Amino acid sequence: MVLLKEYRVILPVSVDEYQVGQLYSVAEASKNETGGGEGVEVLVNEPYEKDDGEKGQYTHKIYHLQSKVPTFVRMLAPEGALNIHEKAWNAYPYCRTVITNEYMKEDFLIKIETWHKPDLGTQENVHKLEPEAWKHVEAIYIDIADRSQVLSKDYKAEEDPAKFKSIKTGRGPLGPNWKQELVNQKDCPYMCAYKLVTVKFKWWGLQNKVENFIHKQEKRLFTNFHRQLFCWLDKWVDLTMDDIRRMEEETKRQLDEMRQKDPVKGMTADD
């Protein structure tokens, strides 16, 4: 049994802008989660092309997770089992990410398939699942300006879209009805990231608990990440994809250093 949910994240940026903003924010967020032997290690970051013509950027990362998994898993899992591999094929505006664990092999999988569309999250079944499968998928809307969707320990005033005003674009702050207002704002673009998340965790007695925990963490990550992305708008809106590739190279070097020298930091599972 696998657990599927679709998270819809609406943003006051264009699909083209988001491509740069997402990559910038991934690099920055990685630094915030890396230290004390834990965090992100980038193994591969290179262009790819498949036989069917699909092409984009392929990345392979290892997440060293010790303090970032629940205590009940930490107690049961042997040393080294708490590292997960993330392989991503970014054929923007479509992206596919597959997360696996060498210890659990085919008993553990997180798959995130994302379509980025220039709409307000109104499309049904953008991933074109079979009607019977789609019927069982729960659609969850994430509102980046809704403080109630953010855990108090994750809240940062400087990363609050309800308070942020972009100097370069004039966008923000986002009020309670910002999504409805977007429709009438001719000068402000918008888009939705449709994130279909498949979770499989086969471990007798823990399956439901862990699958639900993972979905809860994915929603938390998507919420925090996209709040940051919008509030960092002025830092990335003028960047090109060439700028991003140079930044990713520098970030890889920094992450290797931070994992060795910095203390453990970032989100922990038991928060």
UniProtKB/Swiss-Prot annotation:
GO cellular component: cytoplasm; nucleus
Any coiled-coil regions, as ranges: none
Catalytic activity from the UniProt record: a 1,2-diacyl-sn-glycero-3-phosphocholine(in) = a 1,2-diacyl-sn-glycero-3-phosphocholine(out); a 1,2-diacyl-sn-glycero-3-phospho-(1D-myo-inositol)(in) = a 1,2-diacyl-sn-glycero-3-phospho-(1D-myo-inositol)(out)
PTM field: Phosphorylated by PKC in a calcium and phosphatidylserine-dependent manner.
A GO molecular-function annotation: lipid binding
Stated consequence of mutating residue 59 to S/Q/V/I/N/D/E: Loss of phosphatidylinositol transfer activity but no significant effect on phosphatidylcholine transfer activity
Highest taxon above the source species: Eukaryota
UniProt keyword annotations, A-Z: Acetylation, Cytoplasm, Lipid transport, Lipid-binding, Nucleus, Transport
Main location: cytoplasm
UniProt-listed CDD domains: SRPBCC_PITPNA-B_like
Keyword Cytoplasm set for record: yes
Biased composition (Basic and acidic residues): 251-264
Summary of activators and inhibitors of this protein: Phosphatidylinositol transfer activity is inhibited by N-ethylmaleimide.
UniProt protein name: Phosphatidylinositol transfer protein alpha isoform
Species assigned in the record: Rattus norvegicus (Rat)
Taxonomic lineage of the native organism: Eukaryota, Metazoa, Chordata, Craniata, Vertebrata
